[in-house]
Each structure stands twice: as C-alpha cells, then as structure tokens.
C-alpha cells in the first residue's frame, strides 16, 4: 500500500487533492497544513504532494514548501510533486529532485497522468528483487537500490552498499 502525504496550507485544497489521489490509487493518505508538521511525521512516505507557498504569515518559523522539500530530500527518496500557483519556482523545484511540478488551478487530466507515472515508478522500485550472493557458506540478500558500486579484488567481487561492503 502506498503512503502518500499532502501538504498545503489551504484545507479545501488538501481535501480536493485527497479526492483526486483517491481516484488514482488506494493507499494511506495523510494531510498536513504546514512543512513543520510533515517533517515531524516519522512515516516513510512514497509520494508527497507539496505546495511551495505554505502560509508563513501565520507562523514564520515554519518552512516553506521548497525548504521542506530540501529537508525531505536529506532523509528520503520519496517522489515529490509540487502543486502550486507559483511558476517562478519550477527550476528550483527540479533542483531538489521533484518528480513533477503541477500548477494551480489543477488540470485533473494532467494530475491523473502525473499520478499514474509516479505510481508506476514507485511500484517498479518496490518490486525489484534483491540480489542474492553467497558470502562464505551463507546467502545474503542485498536490495539492488542499496548497491553503490562493485569492485574486482583478486578474483573476488566486492560490493559497496549504502550500509556496508559485501565480498
């Protein structure tokens, strides 16, 4: 089941986005009014729909959407789709690794197309079989996306992963 976060300072927009997401897929959908709430949630989200202009007038201490995306990117590879009225941040959005950038008012057909592509990418990543290697007399399963690179050392292959090396 997909874990999806929707973060927008306007409650009607959050509810509208939730309805659109529910038309596209099933999953656990969590709603957030600001970036601070989203960042405080320990859930490992697969997909995050994020407004850039989160209302900082009410609480200037809260991060805007771009700052929130940067902090998310430090700890997660969740797909981020910006949903905003601000055209001027489109290139900066891709600098933080956004999957897509949708402009308000939302074109429902475009939203569905982007969601379909995002869901396919998430599911294909989740369905990758781990690499099984023999280490000594034991078999070890290594997630493919955890492998950084392989190195040949005296007729042995050394896999360097995000967590450790495997001979």
Summary of predicted features, one role per range:
Residues 1-5:
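Non-catalytic signal-transmission and effector/linker regions of two-component phosphorelay proteins
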Residues 12, 55, 149:
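Residues immediately C-terminal
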Residues 27, 40, 45-126:
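CheY-like receiver
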Residues 33-34, 103:
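Short loop/edge segments at beta-strand edges and connector loops
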Residues 116-167:
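Conserved binding/recognition cores within well-folded domains
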């Amino acid at each position: 089941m997909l874990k999806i976060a929707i973060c927008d300072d306007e409650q009607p927009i959050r509810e509208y986005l939730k309805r659109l997401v529910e038309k596209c897929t099933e999953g656990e959908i969590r709603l957030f009014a600001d970036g601070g709430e989203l960042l405080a949630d320990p859930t490992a989200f697969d997909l995050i729909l994020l407004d850039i202009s989160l209302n900082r007038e009410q609480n200037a201490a809260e991060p805007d959407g771009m700052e929130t995306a940067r902090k998310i990117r430090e700890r997660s590879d969740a797909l981020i789709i910006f949903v905003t009225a601000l055209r001027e941040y489109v290139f900066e959005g891709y600098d933080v690794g956004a999957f897509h950038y949708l402009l308000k008012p939302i074109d429902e057909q475009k939203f569905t197309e982007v969601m379909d592509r995002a869901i396919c990418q998430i599911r294909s990543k989740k369905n990758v079989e781990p690499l099984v290697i023999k280490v000594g007399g034991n078999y070890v399963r290594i997630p493919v996306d955890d492998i950084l690179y392989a190195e040949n050392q005296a007729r042995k292959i050394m896999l360097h992963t995000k967590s450790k090396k495997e001979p």
